[in-house]
From Swiss-Prot:
Sequence repeat boundaries on the chain: 161-164, 165-168, 169-172, 173-176, 177-180, 181-184, 185-188, 189-192, 193-196, 197-200, 201-204, 205-208, 209-212, 213-216, 217-220, 221-224, 225-228, 229-232, 233-236, 237-240
Disulfide links within the chain: none
Keyword vocabulary terms for this entry: Host cytoplasm, Late protein, Repeat
Function text: Plays an essential role in the assembly of the icosahedral capsid of the virus. Allows the assembly of 3 molecules of hexon protein p72 and formation of a thermostable trimer.
Region ranges (20 X 4 AA tandem repeats of [CNS]-[ATV]-[DNS]-T): 161-240
Localization annotation: Host cytoplasm
Family label: Belongs to the asfivirus B602L family.
Inducers of expression: Expressed in the late phase of the viral replicative cycle.
CDD domains according to UniProt: TIL
GO cellular component, one term: host cell cytoplasm
Entry protein name: Protein B602L
Length: 570
């Protein structure tokens, strides 16, 4: 299609008004004059909710790349100091000069002077290395505080998919096994250790394999039935190791973090694919695009065995081992929101791109989604009149917006697999809720440190707080009980937590004793709570740097408890 020039068209019309204009030219002119086509004014209103999931993903991708970069930069960083340092080049030059001096064997250069010079250079290098290690240790500690989750410092890890695969495995496995071709599974996992797999996945595959094997044995020789069923079960269980059953395209984190042993039957193919960067990228691209699997026979037979191995490189293992705390995302978002206008102005000044933070959309019509022919007819009828891409939205469901033509199958896949969408939206909702808990955790630790350094609040301040304290604002994040126990523990968080637990136990015991008649369950709960209270009181006497170990000894046919303490590794 030739490039459309409206100035040239206008000039031709003015020079020769009788000239006919082609339909193609009129169509292009229509698109230029009305790029966002509006069809008819309808009184109906569609209510929509929009969540920018792509922005959330990009932020996490940037965070991942940023963490990988700063830790890698720390490994390669060599600090510079005010005094001159011996680089490799200057050190070699000085040593060569000393060697030449020794060869001359003149009386002008005493051997003691040469030795002292060498020792001086060695001491300088040793001092520089020690300072470098100390500086790197300090920076590494700082980076880990902000970018590596620590349950003692942070409220929650940014990684929340740990339990997803386990919880959905049992439900999904039955449908996976039911549609699996037995012959394919048997050949794919022929080298799987059947005994290990059977022991590991017996509870998961028992009911599934029982029904599958029953139908298989009906038309199979009895002697071969057992072998077929065992190999089928082994194949199904082996495949679930490498993929998240709820989201098959995602490589589970535990696979990404560990070094995988390449099976012997795959070693030759893996070596050939990873021999060059071009081959590796091509294979990775094919694995990420299902429609290309037919080009690679071996990958098509068992793609889940190839994909985690190819993507399980030193870089991905390194990145997956540095999981940031959710606190960092919260602080980062708070920084962006608090300095948004300044960041926007600076970004527009530095880069040529313009911000794309607001969205405008139009609803053209409503078509019965059950009639796919009507949906297609609408698209192909108006696609040439509309300058922008057309997206179809399923009413009453969350819908991912994308190109109708180019990415239709891709978006239909996500729209139909609601578990993937649910996981994303649940995470988005969880991110909105976690801010208060992170702020509360930060205030709790800072208040504990303040009590350790300056002591408890003055009595007058406590009276004022008890009079004017409300549940709104920062003060409302910590309860009076928590503040009281922090002061009682002199800022020791471990003891303060024990005091909180003791208060809860005493309150529960008080409620149970206030009842006239206790049920058997309530009596058991009362006994259990009293034991927990006694244990908590004993734990108050355990020093912070020790671990308590309860030992039971036989004393004249009577068991008695002895308490031992061992040094804790801090």
């Amino acid at each position: 299609m030739a490039e459309f020039n409206i100035d040239e068209l206008l000039k031709n019309v003015l020079e020769n008004p009788s000239t006919e204009i082609s339909e193609e030219t009129l169509k292009q002119l229509y698109q230029r004059t009305n790029p966002y086509k509006q069809f008819k004014n309808d009184s109906r209103v569609a209510f929509c909710s929009f969540t920018n999931l792509r922005e959330q993903y990009i932020r996490r991708l940037i965070m991942t790349s940023f963490i990988g970069y700063v830790f890698k930069a720390l490994q390669e960083w060599m600090p510079s100091y005010s005094k001159p340092t011996h680089t490799t080049k200057t050190l070699l030059s000085e040593l060569i000069t000393l060697v030449d001096t020794l060869k001359q064997e003149t009386n002008d250069v005493p051997s003691e002077s040469v030795v002292n010079t060498i020792l001086s250079i060695a001491d300088s290098c040793k001092t520089q290395t020690q300072k470098s290690k100390e500086a790197k240790t300090t920076i590494d500690s700082f980076l880990r505080e902000h970018f590596v989750f620590d349950p003692n410092l942070h409220a929650q890890s940014a990684y929340t998919c740990a339990d997803t695969n386990a919880s959905t495995s049992a439900d999904t496995n039955a449908s996976t096994c039911a549609d699996t071709n037995v012959d394919t599974c048997a050949s794919t996992c022929a080298d799987t250790n059947v005994d290990t797999c059977a022991d590991t996945c017996a509870s998961t595959c028992a009911s599934t394999c029982a029904s599958t094997c029953a139908s298989t044995c009906a038309d199979t020789n009895v002697d071969t039935c057992a072998d077929t069923c065992v190999s089928t079960c082994a194949s199904t269980c082996a495949n679930t190791e490498y993929a998240d059953l709820a989201d098959p395209e995602r490589i589970p984190l535990h696979i990404m973090q560990k070094t995988l042993n390449v099976p012997n039957e795959l070693q030759a193919d893996i070596d050939a694919i990873t021999q060059t960067p071009q081959g590796y990228r091509a294979a990775a691209h094919i694995l990420q695009n299902i429609e290309l699997h037919q080009s690679i026979k071996h990958m098509l037979e068992n793609p889940r065995a190839f994909k985690p191995i190819l993507f399980n490189t030193k870089i991905t293992r390194y990145l997956s081992q540095h999981i940031p705390p959710q606190d960092t995302f919260y602080k980062w978002n708070y920084y962006i929101e608090d300095n948004y206008e300044e960041l926007r102005a600076a970004t527009e000044s530095i880069y040529p791109e313009k911000p794309d933070l607001e969205f405008a959309f139009i609803i053209y019509d409503v078509v019965d989604s059950s009639n796919q022919q009507k949906v297609d007819e609408f698209y192909y009828k108006y696609k040439d009149q509309i300058f922008s891409e057309v997206s179809s939205i399923q009413l009453g469901n969350w819908t991912l917006l994308g190109s109708f033509k180019a990415n239709r199958e891709r978006y239909n896949y996500f729209n139909q697999n609601n578990e993937i969408i649910k996981r994303i939206l649940d995470r988005h909702e969880e991110d909105l809720k976690i801010g208060k808990e992170i702020l509360r955790n930060t205030i709790y630790h800072k208040k504990a440190k303040n009590i350790q350094e300056t002591g408890p609040d003055a009595p007058g301040l406590s009276i004022y707080n008890s009079t004017f304290h409300t549940d709104s604002g920062i003060k409302g994040l910590l309860s009076f009980k928590e503040l009281k126990n922090l002061e009682k523990a002199s800022g020791n968080i471990k003891k303060a937590r024990e005091y909180d637990f003791i208060d809860d136990c005493e309150e529960k015991i008080k409620q149970l004793l206030s009842k006239e008649n206790l049920t058997p369950d309530e009596e058991s709960e009362l006994i259990k709570t009293k034991k927990q209270l006694n244990n908590a009181l004993e734990m108050l006497n355990v020093p912070d740097d020790t671990i308590r170990v309860d030992m039971w000894v036989n004393n004249n046919n009577k068991l008695e408890k002895e308490i031992l303490y061992t040094k804790a590794e801090l």
